[in-house]
Amino acid sequence: MVRPVSRSDQAADSIVRNAMFAGASKLSGAAFTAVLTIFLVRYLGPEEYGVFALALGVGGLMTVPADLGISVSVARFIAERRGDPDAMARFASDAIRLKIFVTGAASLALLVVAGPIANAYDTPDLAWPLRILAVATFGQSVMIMCATIFEALGRLSVYLRVVLAESALEATGSIVIVLLGTGATGAMVGRAAAYSFAAGFGLVLVARTLGRSIRPQRGGHGHARRILGYGSALVIVDGAFTVFSQIDVLLIGAILGVTAVGHFDAAYRLAGLLLFIGGPIRSAVAPRLARGEGGPDREALELTLRYLVLAQGVILAPLIVWAEPLTRIAFGTDYLASADVLRALAPFALLSAISPLLAGAANYLGAARRRVPIALFTLAVNAAIDAALLAQLGIVAGAIGTDVAYVIYVGAHLHLCRDLAGLRLRPLVAPLVGSLSAAAVMGLVLLAFGTGADLAVPLVVIGGALGTAAYVAVLLVTGQVTREERTAVWRRLRPAA
């Protein structure tokens, strides 16, 4: 039985509160992921970690067939019906029913083809990690749907509990199991157990938040066709983007081998740990673009994009200037070959701040079909550059392909949001110039401390703090942050009287 729901349970939180809790979810997950990734990279070594990374890359291709656009599609319909818990619960119930069949079938398919895939890569040790990943895929897909539902409800504070549970279980469980000598297979067992628990926990919290039963009903509530209808376009978009995120790993594995995969993936994940801003902001802002009561909130989108452009530039200088010391500190000297990849991924890192928000806004605006050609074209560009340059340039070619394709992807989504929500692009030019100028000054500060791989950790900490201060100072001096904005921030930060 579902407990009675209070008005506060159903009311959506503010953008700031949702962003804070989404950020906390992302940051806590990133912290656990950082610990686990560094442990696995160091303990397993490049070859065995390469097997683990390749398994995740192959399994990542199952993300789309395991979802069929259900998660984002149901989130859109729920966001359009805020204030009607009965309608929201019916959509959630039908989505869960679809998930059981769709995700279950995809996981079973991965289980069946694990052996042939391992043989195709001439890596027998890949088979069991893939088989166990089939279980993790089911739990992860259900957990993702719970995330989108809480996003649509504007109750990301509740979802934080799910993230903490999954992240803690995966990190601790995987480390303990790997220490028993189970290698990449053991790491995958920890992942599967954590996602399975998180999936069940997330569904319980969704039901409690709505105060309604979301148990799937025989025959459903009549929303399955609508969910799958909008999801059909999202399947193509998500499929292309999923392949986009894995194509570098897959092509590097096929052309250069699993050790090269380990070096590339380590740098890619390190860059990803710095990119936690875009996702939480998307979760807080994008649902407000749904065409429900009040219509798309263009002002929220414009203001958020401005702040993202100003803030995200702070990561450029460390990625470019300190690629070697950051790689050595995180992964050790065996991974110094990853430094060039980390440096080359700097443009991708910058664009990743605003990309999730733009994509999420388009989805809630009901424009999934217009995103299809954008996604397919950027995937083709990335794959073409990789195929053409990997043999000549090595793993850095993967970063180049990602950068070029992402420039196209983000630019196209900016124009899409302009057409659908009236987004004004000119006001973003000044913040971008200011951010790049501040990053250049920050880079000079970091250069003063040295760039060698042997740079001491205390110097990295001190230099990073001074460089960040220089970055903020440039934004203030150039007027990118107004007096009113500084006053508002101070009011939020100062202690209550």
What is each stretch, according to the model?
Residues M1-D9, L447-A497:
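Membrane-proximal transmembrane or re-entrant/amphipathic helices at the cytosolic face
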Residues A11-S71, T103-L111, A136, E170-A171, ...:
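Signature of the first transmembrane helix
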Residues M1-P4, S93-D122, T172, V176-L180, ...:
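Alpha-helical transmembrane segments of multi-pass membrane transport and lipid-handling proteins
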Residues D13-T33, A55, L68-G115, W128, ...:
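Membrane-water interface segments that mark the loop-to-transmembrane alpha-helix transition
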Residues M1-T33, D86-A89, S93, L126, ...:
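N-terminal membrane topogenesis motif
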Residues A79-R97, H263-L376:
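Specific pore-lining/lateral-gate transmembrane helices of multi-pass inner-membrane transport
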Residues R17-T37, A165-E166, G190-A198, G202-V206, ...:
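Transmembrane helical elements of multi-pass membrane transporters/channels
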Residues W128-R131, L160-G211, F377-A384, Q392-C417, ...:
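Hydrophobic alpha-helical transmembrane segments
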